[in-house]
């Protein structure tokens, strides 16, 4: 793991969290219990404070940053998809930010909301609970359905379970020269399938 102190501030990571060795945490970063931080994520607390609350996940290649005197917060059980950028914003409890989305300064994503992949949420946007947001700029198109929220929660549970799986078995290795016979497929811990 790459942890860096900045002007005397050292990242704080709960012992039950998993931070991938290629992720970078700088300065005023607080990572809560059971959090998953994926490969190549950058959490740069060299201006504002970054808080990732319990059970949330920050996936591969995500960036968190913010201005001085601001907090960038991912609420409890928040789900931040691959390549998303969060800058000086607040992601509500149990909300999902889709892959490669950008959430700008002062924006607030409501609890149990879903931001569709590749959306751009403008600075100062204030969402309500359980909105489906999409587009560039993003706008609320309807409420999140019970089925969609269930699907989101199954995906988040997969990442919460992945924390323990990574602690138990992830380690650096050398590649095999050829695939062994009868190689098993990896299995998830829920019955979640891709949304179509």
From Swiss-Prot:
The protein's annotated pathway: Amine and polyamine metabolism; carnitine metabolism
Annotated keywords: Repeat, Transferase
Region (Disordered): 173-196
One term of GO molecular function: transferase activity
GO BP term, pick one: carnitine metabolic process
Protein name, as recorded: Carnitine operon protein CaiE
Family per record: Belongs to the transferase hexapeptide repeat family.
Record's compositionally biased regions (Polar residues): 187-196
Function: Overproduction of CaiE stimulates the activity of CaiB and CaiD.
């Amino acid at each position: 793991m790459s942890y860096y102190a900045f002007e005397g501030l050292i990242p704080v990571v709960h012992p039950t969290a998993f931070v991938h060795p290629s992720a970078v945490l700088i300065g005023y970063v607080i990572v809560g219990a059971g959090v998953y931080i994926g490969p190549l994520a950058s959490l740069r607390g060299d201006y504002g404070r970054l808080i990732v609350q319990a059970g949330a996940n920050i996936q591969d290649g995500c960036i968190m940053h913010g201005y001085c005197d601001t907090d960038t917060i991912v609420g409890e059980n928040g789900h931040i998809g691959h390549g998303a950028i969060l800058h000086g914003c607040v992601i509500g409890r149990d909300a999902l930010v889709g892959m490669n989305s950008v959430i700008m300064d002062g924006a607030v994503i409501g609890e149990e909301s879903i931001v569709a992949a590749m959306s751009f949420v403008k600075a100062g946007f204030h969402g309500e609970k359980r909105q489906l947001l999409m587009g560039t700029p993003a706008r609320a198109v309807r409420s999140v359905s019970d089925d969609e929220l269930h699907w989101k929660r199954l995906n988040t549970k997969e990442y919460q379970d992945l924390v323990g799986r990574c602690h138990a078995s992830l380690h650096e290795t050398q590649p095999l020269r050829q695939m062994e016979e009868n190689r098993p497929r990896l299995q998830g811990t829920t019955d979640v399938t891709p949304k179509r």
